[in-house]
Amino acid sequence: MRRRAVFLDRDGVINRTIMRNGKPCPPASVEEIELLPGVKSCLEKLCDLGLFPIVVTNQPDVARGAQRMEIVEQIHASLIQRLPLQGIVVCYHDDSDNCSCRKPEPGLLLEAAARWSIDLERSFMIGDRWKDVEAGRRAGCTTFLIERTYSEKERCVADYCVESLVQATEIVVGRIAQASHEGTQDQ
């Protein structure tokens, strides 16, 4: 039987987004990583339910020359050391590269599904940008949008709009408990 996953965007979901010149930006170093409240306990709850937490993240600053790949890899090594994550799948491309992995394309989720034998239709995508939700939708996942005050040009329709990973986790736990009680395999 294929596994279920919770795909998570990184910045704004796992760790605090850094605002620079009014725009949400990723941490520039390991020292700038600040985990959001409740993240570790949420991931532990999801693992306890048999879900695989997998980070799927766009990191275009590498392609733009604004960040070194080694720094991004150090940040990810730190997150894997601190949190119960199955793995982290990264797109280093910029929009102009027209790749299939950069969200809103579903390539990162498809790659993770192939690598870890994930059942996408029984999995979840949690993000804070329209691109996260759209990637999850295109991959067939149940989607969550953590509402932030970003100025987004695109609008999205998520299955659930929530305030935090904590709230999203409560919904996932509730759906799985309800399905278990009803004896169904669905969420």
Placement of each model-derived feature along the sequence:
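Conserved Lys-Pro-Asp/Glu-containing loop-to-beta segment of HAD-superfamily phosphomonoesterases
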Residues: 100-131
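Short, electropositive alpha-helical surface patch
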Residues: 62-83, 103-115, 144
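Acidic, Mg2+-coordinating phosphoryl-transfer loop and its flanking beta/alpha structural elements
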Residues: 125-163
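Active-site neighborhood of HAD-like aspartate-dependent phosphohydrolases
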Residues: 1-52
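Structural recognition of alpha->loop->beta junctions
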Residues: 75-95, 153-173
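Substrate-recognition element of Asp-dependent hydrolases with the DxDx(T/V) motif
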Residues: 39-72, 76, 85-94, 136
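Hydrophobic "anchor" residues on beta-strands that sit immediately upstream
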Residues: 5-7, 54, 124, 160
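Non-catalytic pre-domain segments flanking phosphatase-related domains
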Residues: 1-10, 18, 170, 174-186
